[in-house]
From Swiss-Prot:
UniProt catalytic activity: Exonucleolytic cleavage in either 5'- to 3'- or 3'- to 5'-direction to yield nucleoside 5'-phosphates
Protein name according to UniProt: Exodeoxyribonuclease 7 small subunit
InterPro entries: Exonuc_VII_S, Exonuc_VII_ssu_sf
EC number per UniProt: 3.1.11.6
Source species of the chain: Rhizobium rhizogenes (strain K84 / ATCC BAA-868)
UniProt key word ATP-binding: no
Gene that specifies this protein: xseB
GO biological process, one term: DNA catabolic process
Any GO MF annotation of the entry: exodeoxyribonuclease VII activity
Length: 83
């Protein structure tokens, strides 16, 4: 398996990526991993972190905020970023 294939996490769900990232952090914090393996799993962790950030950003763009009228009653929704 190529290095880029080992780092490919693009088809992971957010939950799967976070779970694997937590596992990697725990392994690195224990300190019982050889240097070469530590570097490899750190790189995988970076790929997982970036993937999670991408998924979170996409989710934020889909969230809408509730628009209130002058009386403070819900009037509708608008995109979070105001566009």
């Amino acid at each position: 398996m190529s290095e880029s294939a080992k780092l490919d996490v693009s088809d992971y769900s957010f939950e799967k990526a976070v779970a694997e990232l937590e596992s990697i952090v725990a392994r690195l914090e224990r300190g019982d991993v050889a240097l070469d393996e530590s570097i490899a799993i750190y790189e995988r962790g970076e790929a997982l972190k970036k993937h999670c950030e991408t998924l979170l950003s996409a989710a934020e763009n889909r969230i809408e905020k509730i628009r209130l009228d002058r009386a403070g009653k819900p009037q509708g929704t608008e995109p979070l970023d105001g566009q």
